[in-house]
A protein has these predicted regions:
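Phosphate/oxyanion-binding active-site loops and adjacent basic polyanion-contact surfaces
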Residues: 15-19, 69-77, 105, 189
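Short beta-strand-to-loop acidic/aromatic patch adjacent to the donor-nucleotide binding site
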Residues: 91-102
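Conserved catalytic core of nucleotide-sugar-dependent glycosyltransferases
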Residues: 102-191, 195-198
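Active-site-proximal specificity loops/subdomain of glycosyltransferases
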Residues: 43-90
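A conserved hydrophobic helix/loop-capping motif in glycosyltransferases and polysaccharide synthases
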Residues: 6-18
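Short loop->beta transition adjacent to catalytic acidic/histidine clusters or analogous donor-positioning motifs
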Residues: 4-6, 29-42, 59
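Short, well-formed alpha-helical segments that are part of the catalytic scaffolds
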Residues: 15-32
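C-terminal catalytic/acceptor-binding lobe
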Residues: 168-279
């Protein structure tokens, strides 16, 4: 089996200690995998400079201004992917991660890439759903963790998302028809669907083809455990930790083998974790 060249886009506003631990996980645990020939980390950051004054373990650090939640995340993701397109053209797959989204079960991660390569799938993600609303075409996809085929996405222009351009043009319609904001989860998924349409030119079978060429990570569904959009934070089968509170995260991290790094060491050794993500 050929090895994969992957790149990680880590996008951060204020969860800087989460981002550092995430990089420790990637450069120790992920890097130990025999199926990756290289892992590049592109860190896109739009917080204040004094929150994150210098690089940690990323290959590239991109600094942007923060225009707000959805647009900010969109611009960070777009900037990270643009850097990969310009600098790491031979990458096979890109992993997009929020800083507080840690994946610590290596075999689960490896199986995602093996399945995508074997079945020629272009996207791995799950629905941003809740128990009574599971249609991914309506709720969109998780954007705190997803994987995509880099060359396919580049060919069919899945990125940039250009959230601001879309928002400026259509936000009033969203408020008028749905009473809701423009969702980044839906916008990125719509760009994936558009790529499928460009490739196959089949309107009638578009939804079927979109699902057929996607690895749906149903182990994470539903992401929200009730109809009030209360988030689940831990998926043991995946080894996926997304807590905002560091204390339960730390308790789980203690049990993970083959991870190391300065930020992990500091976290596990600290009796008081009040320093974490504090600015």
């Amino acid at each position: 089996m050929s090895k994969f060249k992957i790149a990680v886009v880590l996008y951060t506003y204020d969860r800087t200690d989460d981002a550092k631990v995430n990089m420790d996980i990637i450069t120790s645990l992920w890097q130990s995998s025999k199926i990756f020939s290289s892992i590049k980390i592109v860190h896109a950051f739009n917080g204040q400079r004094n929150w994150y004054p210098k690089k940690y373990k990323e290959d590239d650090l991109i600094r942007l201004k923060n225009p707000g939640h959805f647009q900010g995340a969109s611009e960070l993701i777009d900037a990270g992917i643009k850097k990969i397109q310009d600098k790491y053209k031979d990458v096979d797959y890109v992993v997009v991660l929020a800083p507080d989204t840690w994946l610590v079960k290596l075999n689960y991660l490896e199986n995602i890439f093996k399945k995508m390569a074997k079945d020629e799938l272009y996207l791995a993600t799950c629905a941003w759903d809740k128990p009574d609303w599971k249609n991914i075409f309506e709720v969109g996809m998780a954007v705190d963790f997803f994987v995509f085929d880099f060359k396919w996405a580049k060919k069919y222009k899945m990125f940039p998302t250009n959230y601001k351009q879309f928002y400026d043009k259509y936000s009033d319609l969203f408020l008028y028809f749905r009473g809701s904001n423009v969702s980044l989860e839906k916008l990125i998924f719509s760009h994936y669907i558009r790529g499928i349409l460009k490739q196959y030119n089949d309107n009638n079978g578009l939804k079927h083809l979109s699902l057929e060429k996607m690895l749906r990570l149903t182990d994470r569904e539903p992401i929200h455990k009730d109809t009030k959009w209360t988030r689940q934070m831990y998926w043991p089968k995946m080894g996926l930790l997304t807590h905002h509170d560091i204390k339960p995260k730390k308790a789980l991290l203690v049990k993970v083998k083959n991870i190391k790094g300065e930020s992990i060491k500091k976290l596990l050794a600290s009796k008081n974790v009040d320093y974490f993500n504090k600015h």
